[in-house]
From Swiss-Prot:
One of its GO terms (molecular function) is flavin adenine dinucleotide binding. NAD-binding protein involved in the addition of a carboxymethylaminomethyl (cmnm) group at the wobble position (U34) of certain tRNAs, forming tRNA-cmnm(5)s(2)U34. Belongs to the MnmG family. It holds the Pfam family GIDA_C_1st. The gene is mnmG. Its cofactor is FAD. It comes from Bacillus licheniformis (strain ATCC 14580 / DSM 13 / JCM 2505 / CCUG 7422 / NBRC 12200 / NCIMB 9375 / NCTC 10341 / NRRL NRS-1264 / Gibson 46). This is tRNA uridine 5-carboxymethylaminomethyl modification enzyme MnmG.
């Protein structure tokens, strides 16, 4: 028998990286929020790599912070090393990556949730949703407890019908031998949701004491203090190194000789794996001309000897994994503490979602994270904060928030999922963003703090500091634009010493900065400000001046996109009534139900000719009501 256990505005199911952001975003907006998780000891657990950030993903972490989320602050408090990647490249592809102390990361995040007003944490297994009048009105747990709410966010990760596969051994399990969620998956199918089967994997963990580090290359963190959060003022200085080694021809031979025992090649694994994070057996087969592959040895924390063998994800049998490890320089006598494994799980087809991450089938039900077909902690957290914002706002009777592709990588991620869907675990890449020069690591606050403030996730104090930073950037740009640097003997000598050509005449400081050999520091040596300019302000000034032409071009493209985004498609449109649209396009439009002409144009199978016909139809105002 069921019993009524509580009434909330929002219930979040799952407390992984999507769940914690969803719960915090909801609660911080003033919605009474419950987060239910199978195991309270596994809040924000990292079942795979102990790291946060990297290309595109690191920018998402900063976007989460600019909106008022927690991931950036948490990793700033708990990392063991941090590096800025792609420093030799342009600002569009730079990104932070941090190695986490995974246990401290969990502990700190759980503490944050426990101390958040409006937020209740409970351990429990959700098996069914409460559906009333076609809308989601809460959840029912394994013990019969009914938690009623106005909205529900599912962030179930890889737990839905999870199955661990290791060699010829397979069993029902969530990640890291956690209890899987079987009945909720079956219930979603009963409700009419289309599910797909995906797979991900993890490498073995080895004992640090048994590694011969003299045969590996040290990979230290940056000496310059780094942080993901715009609010971080205290930096961790005692960083731990990672280590680089490589597979050998012997490693590849062992893998080749045991492919018949690999669940990936025996047909035992049915789920589709992530393209951009292949297993070692996949790498050896697909790139058989490569004599070796990189292996990074990453400590899992400060108070453990477990080391994560990055680059060796595998589901080969345990005995093969042991042999394989012993052929890698530095790991000849290594002790394997945990074997690598693959995990299969259910995900929903994400074209069943609106851009708010609410399901089209059941109003009031939102989904975020790996349940939507993505891979990665950062992608999960980015969806989590948006699902939490929108579930909270719906519960409080407020307007939805949708980030566009030109606002944020989070906008690109969600738009790709709900518009194009995915037939493999989706990973965010810089190449997926058309406006990547606008979506930089350095300007996430300038893009999104205003939105975070408007929805109540950014404090008044932080917002004032943000406004001061914006004003300082504009003031310094204006100052440099007004300064003329004259071709004096000293100035000419200085410019020549930097490898630049002499000035023919006086030049604006802003124009001088656009020269490849010049930067903010070198230009302000010739035209110093009255007071020292903060480092983050100087960085913005330099990027905005140096890349002004490219940024301007991107902004013009965004304006064109906005015109298309503003051409809304009424929900009551009947695509069957539009003559001339191709059959495939009609089917896709009916499935995705795009909100705007711009979104319609991004659906695969919808061609420019179909968009032209749709535009004419909309402009003529011939919107037929859907047949009752």
């Amino acid at each position: 028998m069921g019993y009524e256990a509580g009434q909330y505005d929002v219930v979040v199911v799952g407390a992984g990286h999507a769940g914690v952001e969803a719960a915090l975003a909801s609660a911080r907006q003033g919605a009474k929020t419950l987060v239910l998780t199978i195991n309270l000891d596994m809040v924000a657990f990292m079942p795979c790599n102990p790291s946060v950030g990297g290309p595109a993903k690191g920018i998402v972490v900063r976007e989460i912070d600019a909106l008022g989320g927690e991931m950036a602050k948490n990793i700033d408090k708990t990392h063991i090393q941090m590096r800025l990647l792609n420093t030799g490249k342009g600002p569009a592809v730079r990104a932070l990556r941090a190695q986490a102390d995974k246990f401290q990361y969990q502990h700190e995040m759980k503490k944050t949730l426990e101390n958040e007003p409006n937020l209740t944490m409970l351990q429990g297994m959700v098996e069914r949703l409460l559906i009333e009048d076609g809308e989601c009105r809460g959840v029912i747990t394994q013990t019969g407890a009914e938690y009623r709410s106005k909205t529900v966010v599912l962030t179930t990760g890889t737990f839905l019908r999870g199955k661990i596969i290791l060699g010829d051994l397979s069993y029902s399990s969530g990640p890291n031998n956690q209890q899987p969620s079987i009945k909720l998956s079956e219930h979603l199918e009963e409700l009419g949701f289309d599910l797909v089967r995906f797979k991900t994997g993890t490498p073995p963990r080895v004992n640090s004491h048994s590694i011969d580090y003299s045969k590996t290359e040290i990979q230290p963190g940056d000496e310059v203090p780094r942080a993901f959060s715009y609010e971080t003022v205290e930096y961790i200085t005692d960083q731990l190194p990672c280590w680089l080694t490589y597979t050998s021809p012997e490693t590849h031979e062992i893998i080749d000789n045991n492919l018949h025992r690999s669940p990936m090649y025996s047909g035992m694994i049915k789920g589709t794996g992530p393209r951009y994070c292949p297993s070692i057996e996949d790498k050896v087969v697909r790139f058989n001309d490569k004599p070796r592959h990189q292996i990074f040895l990453e400590p899992e924390g400060r108070n453990t000897q477990e080391v994560y063998v990055q680059g060796l994800s595998t589901s080969l049998p345990e005995d093969v994994q042991r042999k394989m490890l012993s052929t890698i320089p530095g790991l000849e006598n290594v002790q394997m503490m945990r074997a690598g494994y693959a995990i299969e799980y259910d995900a929903i087809v994400p074209t069943q979602l609106w851009p708010t991450l609410e399901t089209k089938k059941i109003p009031g039900l939102f989904t975020a994270g790996q349940i939507n077909g993505t891979s990665g902690y950062e992608e999960a957290a980015g969806q989590g904060i948006m699902a939490g914002i929108n579930a909270g706002r719906k519960a409080l009777g407020k307007e939805e928030v949708i980030l566009s592709r030109s606002d944020a990588y989070i906008g690109v991620l969600i738009d790709d999922l709900v518009t194009k869907g995915t037939n493999e675990p989706y990973r965010l890449l810089t190449s997926r963003a058309e406006y990547r020069l606008l979506l930089r690591h350095d300007n996430a606050d300038l893009r999104l703090t205003e939105i975070g403030y408007q929805i109540g996730l950014i404090s008044e104090e932080r917002y004032q500091k943000f406004q001061e930073k914006k004003a300082a950037i504009e003031a310094e740009k204006k100052r440099l634009h007004s300064v003329i640097i004259k071709p004096t003997k000293e100035n000419q000598e200085y410019i020549r010493s930097l490898g630049g050509s002499e000035l023919k005449d006086g030049i604006r400081a802003t124009d001088l900065m656009k020269r490849p050999e010049m930067n903010y520091e070198t230009v302000t040596a010739l035209a110093p400000p009255e007071q020292k300019v903060a480092g983050d302000v100087a960085e913005q000034v330099e990027i905005q001046i140096k890349y002004e032409g490219y940024i301007e071009k991107s902004l013009q493209q965004v304006e064109k996109l906005k015109k298309m985004e503003n051409k809304k498609i009424p929900d009551r449109i009947d695509y069957d009534a539009i003559k001339g649209i191709a059959t495939e396009a009609r089917q896709k439009l009916k499935e995705v139900r795009p909100l705007s002409v711009a979104q319609a144009s991004r659906i695969s199978g919808v061609n420019p000719a179909d968009i032209s016909i749709l535009l004419v139809y909309l402009e003529q105002g011939r919107i037929a009501k859907v047949a009752e």
